């Protein structure tokens, strides 16, 4: 069974780390081991809320270090799931090309791409950095628009329309502010965290021991 990789993308300050803290809290199940790889160094830290070593945070300097260390990190921690956090200074295709190399595809698969954006600056980024930012939006399964409390309705509508024009298939999660990410995710019921996942993790871990 391949390790699931989730990519959390977005520009510095968009709220990626807060989002990761929320998905860790809302989606981890008993027996699941998660490796979080941070390819950026923002102010906010991943919160290790439990004490049973169910997830590990490892900071990487750049994409070259990811290529160099990913396999050894997988062997060291034997995760069920990997979350990669990186900002918009790395082209989307760059990290995609790395993770699609044969050595990684044999043991891993990208299952979900999240794009996290600040609703206040999203339109400006799309208008000014369109060719750079569009691939992130195009390939996202879920797009998180943060800080909607601080957006005029007109601006929020423009943001949603621009996203829909670029990626009509993605699930758009509108978050009022950084304090409500977790509750908004919980209410949306879009994360894999139920009985079937618990059973799947238990079976996978059982066979890994043999």
Predicted features along the sequence, with ranges:
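Short, charged/polar "capping" segments at the starts of alpha-helices
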Residues: 42-48, 122-123, 151-156, 180-182
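Classical N-terminal secretory signal peptides
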Residues: 1, 142, 206-210
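Short, surface-exposed, polar/charged, turn-prone segments marking secondary-structure boundaries
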Residues: 34-36, 62-67, 109-113, 137, ...
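Short, hinge-like loop/turn segments at secondary-structure boundaries
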Residues: 52-54, 132-133, 189-192
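Short beta-strand/turn micro-motifs composed of small residues
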Residues: 9, 38-40, 117, 145-147, ...
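C-terminal accessory "lid"/substrate-recognition subdomains
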Residues: 152-210
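Phosphate/Mg2+-binding loops and adjacent switch elements
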Residues: 86-162, 166-167
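Nucleotide-state-sensitive switch-loop elements of NTP-binding domains
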Residues: 2-9, 14, 18-112, 123
């Amino acid at each position: 069974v391949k390790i699931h990789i989730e990519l959390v993308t977005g520009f510095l300050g968009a709220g990626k780390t807060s989002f990761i803290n929320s998905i860790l809290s809302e989606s981890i199940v008993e027996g699941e081991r998660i490796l979080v790889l941070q390819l950026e160094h923002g102010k906010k830290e991943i919160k290790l809320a439990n004490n049973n070593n169910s997830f590990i945070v490892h900071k990487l300097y750049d994409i070259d270090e990811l290529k160099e260390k990913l396999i050894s990190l997988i062997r060291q921690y034997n995760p069920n799931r990997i979350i990669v956090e990186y900002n918009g200074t790395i082209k989307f295709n760059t990290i995609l090309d790395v993770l699609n190399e044969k050595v990684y595809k044999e043991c891993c698969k990208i299952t979900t791409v999240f794009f996290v954006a600040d609703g206040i600056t999203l339109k400006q980024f799309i208008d000014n950095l369109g060719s750079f930012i569009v691939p992130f939006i195009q390939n996202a399964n879920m797009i998180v628009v943060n800080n909607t409390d601080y957006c005029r309705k007109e601006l929020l509508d423009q943001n949603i329309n621009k996203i829909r024009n670029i990626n009509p298939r993605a699930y758009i999660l509108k978050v009022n502010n950084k304090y409500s990410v977790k509750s908004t995710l919980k209410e949306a019921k879009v994360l894999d965290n139920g009985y079937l996942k618990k059973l799947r993790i238990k079976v996978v871990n059982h066979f890994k021991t043999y």
